[in-house]
Protein backbone atom coordinates (compact mmCIF):
# COMPACT_ATOMS: atom_id res chain seq x y z
CA UNK A 1 0.00 0.00 0.00
CA UNK A 2 1.42 3.29 -1.08
CA UNK A 3 1.90 5.91 1.63
CA UNK A 4 0.54 9.39 1.08
CA UNK A 5 3.08 12.16 1.38
CA UNK A 6 2.33 15.76 2.30
CA UNK A 7 5.32 17.83 1.19
CA UNK A 8 3.70 21.08 2.25
CA UNK A 9 2.94 19.71 5.71
CA UNK A 10 6.52 18.52 6.26
CA UNK A 11 7.94 21.83 5.11
CA UNK A 12 5.79 23.89 7.51
CA UNK A 13 6.42 21.67 10.51
CA UNK A 14 10.18 21.81 10.03
CA UNK A 15 10.07 25.61 10.15
CA UNK A 16 7.74 25.93 13.16
CA UNK A 17 8.62 23.17 15.61
CA UNK A 18 11.11 24.20 18.31
CA UNK A 19 12.89 21.63 20.43
CA UNK A 20 13.62 22.77 23.97
CA UNK A 21 13.60 21.60 27.57
CA UNK A 22 11.05 22.27 30.26
CA UNK A 23 13.65 24.15 32.30
CA UNK A 24 14.48 26.51 29.41
CA UNK A 25 10.80 27.12 28.76
CA UNK A 26 10.23 27.97 32.42
CA UNK A 27 13.21 30.35 32.46
CA UNK A 28 12.03 32.07 29.28
CA UNK A 29 8.56 32.66 30.70
CA UNK A 30 9.88 34.05 34.00
CA UNK A 31 12.57 36.41 32.72
CA UNK A 32 10.03 38.44 30.75
CA UNK A 33 7.53 38.87 33.59
CA UNK A 34 9.35 39.82 36.78
CA UNK A 35 7.02 41.14 39.47
CA UNK A 36 9.11 43.13 41.96
CA UNK A 37 8.34 43.90 45.58
CA UNK A 38 9.84 47.32 46.30
CA UNK A 39 11.53 47.53 49.71
CA UNK A 40 12.76 51.11 49.78
CA UNK A 41 13.97 52.75 52.99
CA UNK A 42 15.96 55.80 51.87
CA UNK A 43 17.07 57.94 48.92
CA UNK A 44 17.98 55.02 46.62
CA UNK A 45 14.31 54.23 46.22
CA UNK A 46 13.71 57.67 44.67
CA UNK A 47 16.02 56.70 41.80
CA UNK A 48 14.01 53.55 41.21
CA UNK A 49 10.77 55.54 41.25
CA UNK A 50 12.04 57.54 38.27
CA UNK A 51 11.87 54.35 36.17
CA UNK A 52 8.09 54.52 36.28
CA UNK A 53 8.02 57.63 34.09
CA UNK A 54 7.95 57.73 30.32
CA UNK A 55 11.67 58.47 30.01
CA UNK A 56 12.72 54.98 31.09
CA UNK A 57 9.37 53.12 31.02
CA UNK A 58 10.16 49.97 32.97
CA UNK A 59 6.90 48.38 31.74
CA UNK A 60 8.70 47.34 28.56
CA UNK A 61 10.78 44.92 30.67
CA UNK A 62 7.66 43.22 32.00
CA UNK A 63 8.04 44.66 35.51
CA UNK A 64 4.78 44.81 37.42
CA UNK A 65 5.24 46.20 40.97
CA UNK A 66 3.33 44.26 43.60
CA UNK A 67 2.40 45.21 47.14
CA UNK A 68 2.15 41.65 48.44
CA UNK A 69 5.17 39.32 48.73
CA UNK A 70 2.97 36.35 47.82
CA UNK A 71 2.52 37.81 44.34
CA UNK A 72 6.16 38.83 43.76
CA UNK A 73 9.17 36.91 42.53
CA UNK A 74 11.72 39.74 42.90
CA UNK A 75 12.45 41.88 45.94
CA UNK A 76 14.50 45.02 45.43
CA UNK A 77 16.07 46.37 48.62
CA UNK A 78 17.07 50.03 48.43
CA UNK A 79 18.41 51.88 51.45
CA UNK A 80 19.66 51.23 54.94
CA UNK A 81 18.48 48.11 56.76
CA UNK A 82 18.53 48.29 60.55
CA UNK A 83 18.42 45.53 63.14
CA UNK A 84 14.80 46.37 63.91
CA UNK A 85 13.82 46.05 60.25
CA UNK A 86 15.77 42.82 59.65
CA UNK A 87 13.05 40.39 60.87
CA UNK A 88 10.45 42.08 58.66
CA UNK A 89 12.71 41.81 55.60
CA UNK A 90 13.40 38.12 56.22
CA UNK A 91 9.67 37.50 56.71
CA UNK A 92 8.84 39.19 53.42
CA UNK A 93 11.45 37.10 51.62
CA UNK A 94 10.16 33.86 53.11
CA UNK A 95 6.59 34.69 52.04
CA UNK A 96 7.61 35.01 48.38
CA UNK A 97 6.96 31.93 46.23
CA UNK A 98 9.80 30.05 44.57
CA UNK A 99 11.72 30.85 42.47
CA UNK A 100 12.55 34.28 43.92
CA UNK A 101 15.34 36.77 43.34
CA UNK A 102 16.95 39.68 45.19
CA UNK A 103 18.61 42.86 43.90
CA UNK A 104 20.63 44.81 46.48
CA UNK A 105 20.57 48.45 45.38
CA UNK A 106 22.92 51.06 46.81
CA UNK A 107 25.93 51.16 49.12
CA UNK A 108 23.81 51.25 52.29
CA UNK A 109 22.12 47.97 51.38
CA UNK A 110 25.29 46.20 50.24
CA UNK A 111 27.74 47.20 53.01
CA UNK A 112 25.87 49.47 55.38
CA UNK A 113 27.29 52.57 53.69
CA UNK A 114 28.29 55.56 55.75
CA UNK A 115 26.25 54.25 58.68
CA UNK A 116 28.33 51.06 59.04
CA UNK A 117 31.25 52.65 60.90
CA UNK A 118 29.66 54.25 63.95
CA UNK A 119 26.12 52.85 64.07
CA UNK A 120 25.27 49.98 66.37
CA UNK A 121 21.91 49.23 64.72
CA UNK A 122 22.83 49.02 61.01
CA UNK A 123 23.05 45.70 59.18
CA UNK A 124 26.43 45.48 57.40
CA UNK A 125 25.05 44.06 54.19
CA UNK A 126 21.64 42.67 53.37
CA UNK A 127 23.28 39.43 52.18
CA UNK A 128 23.69 38.51 55.85
CA UNK A 129 19.91 38.18 55.99
CA UNK A 130 18.79 36.97 52.55
CA UNK A 131 20.71 35.63 49.50
CA UNK A 132 21.43 38.32 46.90
CA UNK A 133 21.48 37.65 43.14
CA UNK A 134 22.63 41.03 41.79
CA UNK A 135 24.62 43.73 43.60
CA UNK A 136 24.06 47.28 42.36
CA UNK A 137 26.62 49.69 43.92
CA UNK A 138 26.25 53.44 44.01
CA UNK A 139 25.14 56.23 46.31
CA UNK A 140 22.59 56.33 44.80
CA UNK A 141 22.84 54.34 41.53
CA UNK A 142 21.44 55.96 38.42
CA UNK A 143 18.27 54.70 36.72
CA UNK A 144 20.39 53.46 33.79
CA UNK A 145 22.35 51.30 36.24
CA UNK A 146 19.11 49.85 37.61
CA UNK A 147 18.03 48.86 34.10
CA UNK A 148 21.43 47.22 33.57
CA UNK A 149 21.03 45.26 36.81
CA UNK A 150 17.60 44.04 35.72
CA UNK A 151 19.06 43.01 32.35
CA UNK A 152 21.82 41.05 34.07
CA UNK A 153 19.26 39.34 36.28
CA UNK A 154 17.26 38.34 33.20
CA UNK A 155 20.40 36.81 31.68
CA UNK A 156 21.06 34.93 34.91
CA UNK A 157 17.51 33.56 34.94
CA UNK A 158 17.82 32.35 31.35
CA UNK A 159 20.90 30.25 32.21
CA UNK A 160 20.00 28.83 35.60
CA UNK A 161 18.80 25.38 36.56
CA UNK A 162 16.12 25.44 39.24
CA UNK A 163 17.29 22.47 41.41
CA UNK A 164 20.83 23.88 41.49
CA UNK A 165 19.49 27.25 42.63
CA UNK A 166 17.58 25.71 45.55
CA UNK A 167 20.69 23.80 46.64
CA UNK A 168 22.83 26.95 46.43
CA UNK A 169 20.38 28.92 48.58
CA UNK A 170 20.42 26.25 51.27
CA UNK A 171 24.21 26.09 51.42
CA UNK A 172 25.17 29.76 51.03
CA UNK A 173 22.50 31.43 53.15
CA UNK A 174 23.71 33.12 56.33
CA UNK A 175 22.17 35.08 59.15
CA UNK A 176 23.28 37.73 61.62
CA UNK A 177 23.54 36.98 65.30
CA UNK A 178 20.91 38.27 67.66
CA UNK A 179 21.91 41.54 69.28
CA UNK A 180 20.86 41.99 72.90
CA UNK A 181 20.48 45.54 74.13
CA UNK A 182 19.93 46.67 77.70
CA UNK A 183 17.48 49.53 78.00
CA UNK A 184 18.58 52.23 80.43
CA UNK A 185 16.97 55.34 81.77
CA UNK A 186 17.13 58.46 79.66
CA UNK A 187 19.48 61.21 80.84
CA UNK A 188 17.80 63.89 78.75
CA UNK A 189 14.83 64.28 81.10
CA UNK A 190 16.86 65.71 83.98
CA UNK A 191 16.11 62.72 86.22
CA UNK A 192 19.49 61.02 86.36
CA UNK A 193 19.68 57.50 87.61
CA UNK A 194 22.15 57.29 90.47
CA UNK A 195 23.03 53.76 89.51
CA UNK A 196 24.67 54.89 86.25
CA UNK A 197 26.70 57.69 87.84
CA UNK A 198 29.69 57.30 90.16
CA UNK A 199 29.72 59.57 93.18
CA UNK A 200 32.83 59.52 95.39
CA UNK A 201 32.15 59.62 99.13
CA UNK A 202 32.34 63.07 100.70
CA UNK A 203 34.82 63.86 103.49
CA UNK A 204 31.97 64.41 105.95
CA UNK A 205 30.99 60.75 105.65
CA UNK A 206 34.51 59.48 106.44
CA UNK A 207 35.25 58.83 110.14
CA UNK A 208 37.91 61.22 111.57
CA UNK A 209 40.24 58.41 112.73
CA UNK A 210 40.30 56.93 109.23
CA UNK A 211 41.01 60.31 107.66
CA UNK A 212 43.95 61.17 109.99
CA UNK A 213 45.34 57.64 109.72
CA UNK A 214 45.49 57.97 105.95
CA UNK A 215 47.05 61.44 106.21
CA UNK A 216 49.84 60.30 108.55
CA UNK A 217 50.72 57.37 106.29
CA UNK A 218 51.65 59.72 103.46
CA UNK A 219 55.39 60.50 103.61
CA UNK A 220 56.38 64.13 103.35
CA UNK A 221 58.88 65.24 100.73
CA UNK A 222 61.80 67.47 101.74
CA UNK A 223 63.20 70.04 99.44
CA UNK A 224 66.96 69.73 98.90
CA UNK A 225 68.84 72.84 98.05
Curated annotation (Swiss-Prot):
It is a peripheral membrane protein. NDH is composed of at least 16 different subunits, 5 of which are encoded in the nucleus. One of its GO terms (biological process) is photosynthesis, light reaction. It is found in: Plastid, Chloroplast thylakoid membrane. Binds 1 [4Fe-4S] cluster. PROSITE patterns: COMPLEX1_20K (PS01150). Keywords: 4Fe-4S, Chloroplast, Iron, Iron-sulfur, Membrane, Metal-binding, NAD, NADP, Plastid, Plastoquinone, Quinone, Thylakoid, Translocase, Transport. [4Fe-4S] cluster binds at residues 43-44, 108, 139. The keyword Lipoprotein does not apply. InterPro entries: NADH_UbQ_OxRdtase-like_20kDa, NADH_UQ_OxRdtase_20Kd_su. This is NAD(P)H-quinone oxidoreductase subunit K, chloroplastic. Its EC number is 7.1.1.-. Pfam families: Oxidored_q6. The gene is ndhK. Belongs to the complex I 20 kDa subunit family. NDH shuttles electrons from NAD(P)H:plastoquinone, via FMN and iron-sulfur (Fe-S) centers, to quinones in the photosynthetic chain and possibly in a chloroplast respiratory chain. The immediate electron acceptor for the enzyme in this species is believed to be plastoquinone. Couples the redox reaction to proton translocation, and thus conserves the redox energy in a proton gradient. It catalyses: a plastoquinone + NADH + (n+1) H(+)(in) = a plastoquinol + NAD(+) + n H(+)(out); a plastoquinone + NADPH + (n+1) H(+)(in) = a plastoquinol + NADP(+) + n H(+)(out). Its cofactor is [4Fe-4S] cluster. It is an enzyme of class 7 (translocase). PANTHER family: NADH DEHYDROGENASE, NADH DEHYDROGENASE [UBIQUINONE] IRON-SULFUR PROTEIN 7, MITOCHONDRIAL. GO terms for molecular function: 4 iron, 4 sulfur cluster binding; iron ion binding; NADH dehydrogenase (ubiquinone) activity; quinone binding. GO terms for cellular component: chloroplast thylakoid membrane; respiratory chain complex I. Signal peptide: none annotated. The keyword Chloroplast applies.
